[in-house]
Design a protein with these regions (language model features):
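Alpha-solenoid helical repeat scaffolds
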Residues: 4-7, 72
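Alpha-helical junction/boundary sensor with strong preference for TPR arrays
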Residues: 6, 10-13, 17, 77-85
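Acidic, Ser/Thr- and Gly/Pro-rich intrinsically disordered linkers and low-complexity segments
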Residues: 10-42
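Residue signature of alpha-solenoid helical repeat architecture, marking inter-repeat boundaries
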Residues: 40, 45-47, 87-88, 92
Length: 108
C-alpha cells in the first residue's frame, strides 16, 4: 500500500515543506514547475491523498471512527500535501480533510 511504502519519505517531505512554504503549489500551466513539484513532494502528496481515500472507504464500509482517524492522519500528519485536480489546479489535503472530520474528533 502507498501509505506503508512511502510514509518515511512523505514525513521527510512534510518536514522540509513546513520549513519552507507549506502553501506552495506550482502554476498548473508550467510543466517544468509541476514536474519538479511532483519530484520533490510526490510522496507527501500521495500519502496524504491515500489517507483521505482510506477514510472515505472506511466511511462507506460503516466504520466512522476509523474513517475519522484516517482523516486526522491526513490533516495532522500531511498538512502540506496537495492533490492535483482535474481542472489543472491543486486541492489541499488539509482543507479537504478538515471538511471530512467531524467537529467532535480530537487528534490522538
Amino acid at each position: 500500500m502507498v501509505i506503508d511504502k512511502f510514509t518515511e519519505v512523505a514525513n521527510a517531505q512534510e518536514a522540509a515543506k513546513l520549513k519552507s512554504n507549506c502553501d506552495y503549489k506550482p502554476a498548473a500551466n508550467s510543466k517544468q514547475a509541476v514536474d519538479n513539484f511532483n519530484a520533490v513532494y510526490g510522496a507527501l502528496n500521495d500519502v496524504g491523498a491515500a489517507w483521505l481515500l482510506k477514510g472515505i472507504a472506511l466511511e462507506a464500509l460503516g466504520k466512522p471512527d476509523e474513517a475519522q482517524a484516517a482523516y486526522g492522519r491526513a490533516v495532522y500528519d500531511y498538512w502540506c500535501g496537495y492533490i492535483k485536480n482535474p481542472y489543472g489546479g491543486y486541492w489541499s489535503v488539509r482543507i479537504l480533510g478538515e471538511t471530512l472530520i467531524k467537529p467532535s474528533y480530537s487528534n490522538p
